[in-house]
């Protein structure tokens, strides 16, 4: 089996998403395209030869040599502070990918889809939502997005636009709810999760992405609500980044 090679990536654009997150659009000669939900590895090499690698979800999808990803800065991390604070258009990075076949959505799957994101876990789910909107398929899609507060949401404007393209969104604000919100701030309860997501009777595929504790608690909750474990796909990230 041929190893996936490292490729040089030219940073084309850098766009702030929140006070601590940015999107990067890369031009990657030799990139083969990606499926909705895949990720890549980024490698940084210091002047003394020290290397650090981290995985990041891909927000874009499909063929071509342009890749969009979003990075949320982790305090004390080796890679994310550089990508959020230092990288500029014209810089070069090393990337490897696309990676992952499990956490992907395929257009020919007729199953309803429930997307559940915590924080920057929205990135691969946005890729899936973009792909579904572009395909114009008829199966039900829903998104539940949990963030600390409205300013912490990545791609908030685009997510709202996706409502008009058949992907309704439920917002969960865990620390501070915006003025006029119908829901007080706090974590989602099992009863609320059952009410806001596609029911088990419709046998949806469920994609959950976010911090490890969020993913584990949410996966346990949807299984407790009656969803078969084999219909639940998870992707998680820890503190180092």
What are these regions (language model features)?
Residues 2-91, 147-149, 173-176:
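Ferredoxin-reductase
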